[in-house]
């Protein structure tokens, strides 16, 4: 008989992270309690009636808790239905850095990424470049160096250096 999920996690080597839960994973008791409480709430957070306002308040508290854990602002926390929706949401060539619009020309991904990442989100498929991985599934660092060298490290128009140089340090 297999051990319960939490016991299985405790038995695993601390040097190894088991990530093959596919669409489910063991829940900590506190997470299970919070989930059951949320499932018992009848309100739609977008509704103005009392149940909706209560659901919106619970949703806001959850967003704030996640933001604290991540060191982010609550307004920057978005809940999605799963990895595919999240990848589609964040893999975009257009975003803002402060108030300034920024456009990325290329998305570099590792060949072992989840199919939703390989799809490239809102990037044009021609601008998604796949980097090879080694036998352990790690991105080949030489391929990263080659990719960085293949693109200008600085912009002669505005004197800005690419983030890749910061990452290299």
Predicted regions and their residues:
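Pyridoxal 5′-phosphate
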Residues: 1-169
């Amino acid at each position: 008989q297999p051990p319960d999920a939490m016991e299985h996690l405790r038995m695993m080597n601390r040097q190894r992270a088991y990530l093959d839960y596919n669409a489910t994973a063991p829940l900590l008791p506190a997470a299970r309690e919070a989930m059951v409480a949320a499932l018992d709430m009848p309100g739609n957070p977008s509704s103005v009636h009392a149940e909706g306002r209560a659901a919106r308040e619970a949703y806001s508290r959850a967003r704030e808790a996640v933001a604290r854990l991540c060191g982010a602002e609550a307004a920057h926390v978005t809940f999605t239905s799963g990895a595919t929706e999240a990848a589609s949401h964040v893999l975009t060539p257009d975003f803002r850095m402060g108030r300034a619009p920024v456009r990325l020309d290329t998305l570099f991904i590792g060949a072992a990424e989840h199919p939703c990442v390989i799809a490239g989100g809102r990037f044009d498929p021609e601008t998604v470049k796949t980097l090879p991985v080694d036998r352990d599934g790690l991105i080949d660092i030489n391929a990263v160096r080659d990719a960085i060298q293949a693109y200008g490290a600085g912009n002669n128009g505005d004197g800005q250096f690419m983030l890749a140089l910061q990452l290299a340090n």
